[in-house]
Amino acid sequence: MSELSLQDVAVSYGRRVAVEPFSDTIAPGEWVGLIGPNGAGKSSLLRSIAGLVRHAGSIEVDGTRLGDLKDRERAQRVAYVPQEPLIPDDMTVTDYVLLGRTPYIGYWSSESKHDRDVVADTLERLRLGEFAPRLLGALSGGERQRVVLARALAQEAPILLLDEP
């Protein structure tokens, strides 16, 4: 568990302000829900924490500024499940969830026994073990949602962001 600190985080797309300056500290183990109407900036805030959107202000995990980290280091601290994940139909469930262990090209080693064990355990916890060898394109919508969640959980990041999963 880690502390997440947001200091004057703001997001804009051109002249359109998506997130007004926002500050908060979320303690280890605390659960927080962002509630608001469409266009209120909930997804933009989550995407900025995940490092997918440029933002003003500071985002820190346990005192470390996320903006100072390389993508790989950030992924070890923050896992993100987007509203509409890209799911390749021709990849197996196991290989897709393995990407959560090593989410950036150049770091993926499907030969790691530890990574494969974590993926197998994660799939079992979500009752997806029997789906491991299947292609993602053969799964139902609900099964695919659970696989996307498994990928994020397999990262074993202390912070998990769920954008309307």
PLM region descriptions:
Residues 4, 18-21:
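Conserved structural motif at the start of ABC-family nucleotide-binding domains
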Residues 50:
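Helix-to-loop junction immediately C-terminal to a conserved catalytic motif
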Residues 110, 135-139, 143:
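Conserved ABC ATPase signature
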